[in-house]
Swiss-Prot record:
GO biological process, one term: 'de novo' IMP biosynthetic process
This protein's name: Phosphoribosylformylglycinamidine cyclo-ligase
Catalytic activity field: 2-formamido-N(1)-(5-O-phospho-beta-D-ribosyl)acetamidine + ATP = 5-amino-1-(5-phospho-beta-D-ribosyl)imidazole + ADP + phosphate + H(+)
Pathways per UniProt: Purine metabolism; IMP biosynthesis via de novo pathway; 5-amino-1-(5-phospho-D-ribosyl)imidazole from N(2)-formyl-N(1)-(5-phospho-D-ribosyl)glycinamide: step 2/2
Keyword Nucleotide-binding appears in the UniProt entry: yes
Provenance organism: Thermoplasma acidophilum (strain ATCC 25905 / DSM 1728 / JCM 9062 / NBRC 15155 / AMRC-C165)
InterPro entries noted in UniProt: PurM-like_C_dom, PurM-like_C_sf, PurM-like_N, PurM-like_N_sf, PurM_cligase
Family annotation (Gene3D superfamilies): PurM-like C-terminal domain, PurM-like, N-terminal domain
Length: 338
């Protein structure tokens, strides 16, 4: 069984690899325990009346697109977004971040662009970048690897776990800005197979291909924090690697997506050029939905009013007893993580 076939990472093998690693992590201190579980969007360290959230992520092979056109100024936004959007899923307010850059050469212009992007992302998420590490590893790194880690804070009585999600609850979707920072192994394979130059105009778009692919990941922190005091949020999911399967990480229920966002042009064109089906697309990409919330049915009007004009938002579906994700419009049925 191949790890990558047709530009698609084998999620089963990836999951087995990760689980094997996690099973070795047997030591835990008796104090400052992890309230959550290893493998969630973020971990929560018990600090008494409050918890500190801690998680890390990176931009993956999206950085290779940036490297190919020497345009790095949005990667920092992506890195911040990938981390803070995970942190807020439990109701945490991200407060600080450290970054890690692994490069094969020292390029001052690249450093300037990367730093600019991180600074913009920090402003958007209202966090401080308090440190980091830059490693020049020409013998190890062929391209560039960008990642970071974020800490946040949440009162213990306000932690959002998804445990009280029930049948009849409403699924709210927040629109994505495009590809965000996932699925780029598949994207790069499709682009190469179709001999599409990054400087070419992207099919069905007025922008160049690299501009479409490098559109920065949307950051949802301010919008989520604004509504937490007025809406009872039962669960949240960041739609990243694994696509819509991430929704099931909130709780093992059936999530029926009756009215998804229309996928942006980039997804439709990639699906056509890559000869992929909708099931594959929804398991790899965000398909227009970057973040999902679950609330009581009687609060849907309030949340729509609260978020109107701030971020694309819509009532996408409902929760049923069962398991997995159903998207009837596209005849897609995805198994959950459980």
């Amino acid at each position: 069984m191949s790890e990558v076939e047709g530009g698609i990472i084998n999620r089963k093998l990836q999951g087995e690899f990760v689980n094997t690693f996690i099973r070795q992590l047997k030591f835990h201190r008796e104090d400052f325990k992890n309230i959550g579980y290893i493998g969630g969007f973020t971990s929560i360290i018990d600090m008494g009346n409050f918890g500190i959230t801690f998680n890390n992520d990176g931009v993956g092979t999206k950085a290779m697109i940036a490297e190919a056109v020497n345009k790095y100024d949005t990667l920092g936004i992506d890195c911040v977004a990938m981390n803070v959007n995970d942190a807020i899923t439990v109701g945490s307010e991200p407060i600080a971040m450290v970054d890690y850059l692994a490069v094969n050469k020292m390029d001052e212009e690249m450093a300037k662009q990367l730093g600019t992007g991180f600074n913009v992302g920090a402003q958007m998420a209202n966090i401080s970048i308090v440190g980091g590490e830059t490693a020049v590893l020409p013998d190890v790194v062929k391209h560039i690897d960008i990642s970071g880690a974020v800490i946040g804070i949440v009162q213990k009585n306000q932690i959002i776990t998804g445990s009280n999600i029930k049948e009849g609850d409403v699924i709210i979707g927040l629109g994505s800005s495009g590809l965000h920072s996932n699925g780029f192994t598949t994207v790069r394979k499709i682009i190469a197979d179709n001999n599409l130059d990054l400087q070419d105009t992207f099919p069905g778009d007025s922008k160049k291909t690299y501009e479409v692919l490098l559109e920065p990941t949307r950051i949802y922190v301010r919008e989520i924090l604004d509504i937490m005091g007025i809406i009872t949020i039962k669960g949240m999911a960041n739609i990243t690697g694994g696509g819509f399967k991430n929704i099931t990480r909130m709780k093992d229920m059936k999530y029926v997506i009756d009215d998804p966002f229309e996928p942006q042009n980039v997804f439709i064109r990639l699906m056509e050029m890559g000869n992929l089906n909708y099931a594959q697309m929804f398991e790899i990409f965000n398909m227009g939905t970057g973040f999902v919330l679950v609330i009581d049915e009687d609060e849907k009007v309030d949340i729509m009013n609260a978020l109107k004009g701030k971020v694309p938002v819509k009532v996408m579906g409902h929760v049923e007893n069962g398991s997995g994700v159903e998207i009837p419009k596209y005849e897609v049925s995805l198994k959950g993580y459980y």
